[in-house]
Curated annotation (Swiss-Prot):
Compositionally biased intervals (Basic residues): 1-11
Protein name in the entry: Small ribosomal subunit biogenesis GTPase RsgA
Protein's GO biological process: ribosomal small subunit biogenesis
Function: One of several proteins that assist in the late maturation steps of the functional core of the 30S ribosomal subunit. Helps release RbfA from mature subunits. May play a role in the assembly of ribosomal proteins into the subunit. Circularly permuted GTPase that catalyzes slow GTP hydrolysis, GTPase activity is stimulated by the 30S ribosomal subunit.
Keywords for this protein: Cytoplasm, GTP-binding, Hydrolase, Metal-binding, Nucleotide-binding, Ribosome biogenesis, RNA-binding, rRNA-binding, Zinc
An example molecular function term from Gene Ontology annotations: metal ion binding
Gene Ontology, cellular component aspect: cytoplasm
Location of the CP-type G domain: 102-272
Residue sites binding Zn(2+) per the record: 296, 301, 303, 309
Domain of life: Bacteria
E.C. number(s) listed in UniProt: 3.6.1.-
Protein family according to the UniProt entry: Belongs to the TRAFAC class YlqF/YawG GTPase family. RsgA subfamily.
Gene encoding the protein: rsgA
Native species: Pectobacterium atrosepticum (strain SCRI 1043 / ATCC BAA-672) (Erwinia carotovora subsp. atroseptica)
Length: 349
């Protein structure tokens, strides 16, 4: 079955966006080869439409054009670029080529399919907090994304200074579910600095990206870790009514930690969409379920109350945490609902 056809309004918007991109391309500053210096290595600090900020090996960041032959360029890409002998309209060079990526962070896009948003990530830092609430479902969604992308996760629970002793014990018990699965878990407070040295050590010599819903303190943590002072990543107050903050960043950007290591701050990872995945990919994304895949009595087992279900039997024995089992089914149900809203069938992915 084919994907649902775009409405006339959607077709007009797609066409208008295409024409606007063409117009921007035509207005780019063009370089003659004689105007350019020798090829150099660099890393993409940020991407702005038809331009990119490139950090050279000398640490200087220059805004560059992008060769039309480059089909994909995102923050974190390692590139070959050439500086101009002089700046033209604020542009200081051109990106010539992109090195192969060892990892790429993607998110699903309704119009463009799977869209890359960052490259060469070593780990995804999943930031959660006890306020507005501790959501294991959100943590599990991020873990499925990490496992699917094959990028190592690090769970960071923020705002622990707001916990009393009894609440701390309950939260610790919840985190033990992930520790038992060999996931790294850190309990921190950007306010009291508790756990910050351990977090700095986990970030050293790696390229990380922070993920988490608004209001969990990602920007506050980054400001503290980066020691930005007055040059801060924007932080919004948490809404008194909803308990949720607002978006605080607009473009992906790479920053260097003073203690070593890098971080890509990206608005595209507030919440990973999973609707493009197949149910089998979600099952594999729960690492404790993998050993039972293919062991059920029926091939089309839904892993609920189906007779002969190996996964449900493991849950009943206590080999699979009830919380994780329930979140697994919640994720599958939410994927079905999103696909229905977006007009996809189960065979369209």
């Amino acid at each position: 079955m084919s994907k649902k056809k775009l409405s006339k309004g959607q077709q007009r918007r797609v066409s208008a966006n295409h024409q606007r991109r063409l117009k921007k391309t035509e207005s780019k500053v063009e370089w003659e080869d004689s105007q350019l210096g020798d090829a150099q290595e660099g890393i993409i600090i940020s991407r702005f439409g038809m331009h990119a900020d490139v950090e050279a090996t000398d640490g200087v960041v220059r805004r560059c054009n992008i060769r039309r032959t480059i089909s994909s360029l995102v923050t974190g890409d390692r590139v070959v670029w050439r500086p101009g002998h002089e700046s033209l309209a604020g542009i200081s060079g051109i990106v010539e080529a992109v090195h192969p990526r060892h990892s790429v962070l993607t998110r699903p896009d309704y119009y463009d399919g799977i869209k890359p948003i960052a490259a060469n990530i070593d780990q995804i830092v999943i930031v959660s907090a006890i306020l507005p609430e501790l959501s294991l479902n959100i943590i599990d969604r991020y873990l499925v994304a990490c496992e699917t992308l094959e990028v190592e996760p690090l769970i960071v629970l923020n705002k622990i200074d707001l916990l009393d002793e009894k609440s701390r014990q309950l939260v610790d018990k919840s985190m033990d579910i992930y520790r038992a699965l060999k996931y790294r878990v850190l309990m921190v407070s950007s306010h009291t600095q508790q756990g910050i040295p351990e977090l700095e050590q986990a970030l050293t010599d790696r390229i990380s990206i922070f993920a988490g819903q608004s209001g969990v303190g990602k920007s506050s943590l980054l400001n503290a870790l980066l020691a930005l002072g007055e040059k801060r990543i924007l932080v919004n107050e948490v809404s008194d009514n909803s308990g949720l903050g607002q978006h605080t960043t607009t473009a992906s950007r790479l920053y260097h930690f003073p203690h070593g290591g890098d971080v890509i701050d990206s608005p595209g990872v507030r919440e990973f969409g999973l609707w493009h995945l197949e149910p089998e990919q979600v099952t594999s994304g729960f690492i404790e379920l993998r050993e039972y895949i293919g062991s059920c009595k029926f091939r089309d087992c839904k892993h609920e109350n189906d007779p002969g279900c190996a996964i449900n039997a493991a849950r009943e024995r206590g080999d699979i945490a009830r919380e994780r089992f329930d979140n697994y089914h919640r994720i599958l149900e939410s994927m079905t609902q999103v696909k229905m809203r977006k007009g996809f069938s189960d065979t369209d992915n």
